[in-house]
Amino acid sequence: MQNGAMKAWLDSSFLSGANQSWIEQLYEDFLTDPDSVDANWRSMFQQLPGTGVKPDQFHSKTRDYFRRLAKDASRYSSAISDPDTNAKQVKVLQLINAYRFRGHQHANLDPLGLWQQDRVADLDPAYHDLTEADFQESFNVGSFAIGKDTMKLGDLIDALKQTYCGSIGAEYMHITSTEEKRWIQQRIESVAGHATFSADEKKRFLNELTAAEGLERYLGAKFPGAKRFSLEGGDALVPMLKELIRHAGKSGTREVVLGMAHRGRLNVLVNVLGKKPQDLFDEFAGKHKEHLGTGDVKYHMGFSSDIETEGGLVHLALAFNPSHLEIVSPVVIGSVRARLDRLDEPSSNKVLPITIHGDAAVTGQGVVQETLNMSKARGYEVGGTVRIVINNQVGFTTSNPLDARSTPYCTDIGKMVQAPIFHVNADDPEAVAFVTRLALDFRNTFKRDVFIDLFCYRRHGHNEADEPSATQPLMYQKIKKHPTPRKIYADKLESDKVTTLEDATEMVNLYRDALDAGECVVKELRPMNMHSFTWSPYLNHEWDESYPNKVEMKRLQELAKRISTVPDAIEMQSRVAKIYADRQSMAAGEKLFDWGGAETLAYATLVDEGIPVRLSGEDAGRGTFFHRHAVVHNQSNGSTYTPLQHVHNGQGQFKVWDSVLSEEAVLAFEYGYATAEPRTLTIWEAQFGDFANGAQVVIDQFISSGEQKWGRMCGLVMLLPHGYEGQGPEHSSARLERYLQLCAEQNMQVCVPSTPAQVYHMLRRQALRGMRRPLVVMSPKSLLRHPLAVSSLEELANGTFQPAIGEIDELDPKGVKRVVMCSGKVYYDLLEQRRKNDQKDVAIVRIEQLYPFPHQAMQEVLKQYAHVHDFVWCQEEPLNQGAWYCSQHHFREVIPFGSALRYAGRPASASPAVGYMSVHQKQQQDLVNDALNVD
């Protein structure tokens, strides 16, 4: 720093507290445009040595330096005569800053010592022109939270290394919030990155490592060669999770929901959640409970239990999950949001989500990014998630980071949401415990995600039958010689006189005896008397059972009027005002109900009865096709008003959320929500049904099969806009055939409602009936405003959902020569063309529920056509799509024996729809003519 500039700076009155903010603003201006500040100030700022980081990141440290000088300028007045000392002072502060930014790159993280990062020049004092001669000099430490104002440089460097280059590598300087950074600095710098634990706590950590290792060795001996996806090498996960639960309990948490993949899952089930070892052994032996459906492999199964902590009982729930990595994460978040909504405490610490990831999967699977992007979105936030990465440095056979990812760390994705990231060596259980408490406290304090990167290794192959040395020879040579985490820590405690060899041996023997006994090995386990009531009213119900379908006409009109009334202070957009005026007319009985009016009235009747409704999707508030307008936007000030939230004071909650632009994570979230909250009608709407296949993993692994595999009921509704209107291959088909292909054992319902009354009753049936199974709806687009797709108030008040609808025109059944069966929008094309042709010999029958197929209802509809032997199934979709291939066996069952069943529709096609309107129109006319023309 130039001597003249320093003297002028120290002599000036700008250091007074009143001008501190002025200096900070001046520096901000300099960072933005150096020419915008006075030449003297610019010269001084330019002489500040660089740190290799961005100017805005460096600014916070310089600003703190200014603040300290402003507090006690006299402390530095003597330095005027020695400007070199002042220059070194700034360099010392920059050295501190360098450790905060990049100390993690020199941390001792890899238990095997194989993973090495390049040396960081910034961490060398010489880089900052600090020499060994300066080591005995005292310098102000700025904001370094060690509890001292000044330290000798040598001592300061030692403290920085202990804090940032030990078994913990802290990454947090990417966070923009100064408050959050200061909080982390206070927590880790005040103890130099090393918390103090009592002898009892250390013994507990050893005991938990003993359990983690003991179970794996026991299973390996008892069931050699069986897949168990061992935790060995990452044993510290067990004490980490147990410490997390203990600390959460003391912090007021009452529920913990965990999601994890296969690695270490069996260990967590037994040693953390308290599953009986004997039950696990039975699963290895192939025994199963008959009532659990088709079942699943043991390392996919969930579990729940109650654990005693110092703060009270904590309910633990480990989510069921498939082998599709990372997809369980948004399911967990959805489950947690449901529990928070049930408590009506969205920012509460009472429910804690913990997601456990693999190092290869957390970087490789896009659903991780989608889930992180939801973490602060209003409809999906849960007050932060503790995200633990079991970083065993290998993904199946891929261990070269240049193959696995494009970032230095597997956790770098966490920086997109400014989550702090704490890397920790899994062979140091005390560092693991310290980081665990730190991470949870950060999450609880700031309501944000936090990552723990548990740096470990995988002692065996991907599974126990795999031979890893074929692809990782050097790594596995090292692993064979490397002692286990339990052995390393037992030796340390013996050396520190905390335990003896006999103590450690006794722990091993006692745990093995407990496994032999087969009973629970988690002493904190308590009888589970919480949460078990939730699903009992929804057991053992069938899809066709009756439900309270009627609503008194007077009440229905009152509700219709209430949800179509907006306060005068709300200035509505003109088209929206017209829609609401029409709904007022519908409520008065002056107009027939359209789709949007009937749908929103269904929600009103449910919340009126205290039943919550949650609706989410990319444009759910308005509706992709401008039909719903559940949320009204004030044109004068941008505020919003949701009429369905103002039915009456004691109503059920109505929440509608415009989702982030995601299918996979959002649908998984809503599945998790619905499986945790059966009382809420949970609905996910795709922007177009075509885009739902972005969530195909959720549909295949959870929605269609979750009950059969895991016994998990779910009442989720999927609204998938579907219909051929000439909009091309990406805006026509929700892929009805794929859902029908997944249907078996009455696992879900697939409906194609064709009238407003049908959607009204379908939604009410889903909420009011006891059965909780997914409902997949091919919802309309053009029918939303079709003049024939309307329903009367009487149909809403006194009707019910009809899985099949017969002929509506007055045709003489005896004169009918052909019956055309169909679903969805094509019905209206057929109806209008038949009326135009003045045909009396073709009846049109609608199948509104394609699965479970309504055999009885269809037989009732068709009984008047017993003389007919010419039947046609008409669909808009190509031959190889739609319902034809999946459902024709049902059609044949309900038509008279020996009758012909013919297809009318588009020819087989690789693409769902054509891209040219003229071709579309010709195809549409051809299929309608084909269905109606009787030779």
Model-derived features: where do they sit?
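Thiamine diphosphate
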Residues: 2-8, 16, 50, 59, ...
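Subset of Sec-pathway N-terminal targeting signals
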Residues: 7-48, 55
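Hard-cation-handling environments
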Residues: 485-486, 496, 500-613
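Glycine/aspartate-rich loop-and-adjacent alpha/beta segment that forms the canonical ThDP
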Residues: 99-102, 106-139, 143-154, 159, ...
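Cofactor-binding active-site loop characterized by glycine-rich and histidine/acidic residues
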Residues: 254-418, 422, 625-677
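Active-site cores of enzymes that catalyze phosphoryl transfer or operate on phosphate-rich substrates
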Residues: 193-215, 281-344, 643, 753, ...
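Extended, charge-enriched "interface" segments that sit outside catalytic cores
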Residues: 11, 48-237, 253
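Conserved phosphate/anionic-ligand binding catalytic regions in large, soluble enzymes, centered on
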Residues: 94-111, 243-272, 357-372, 376, ...
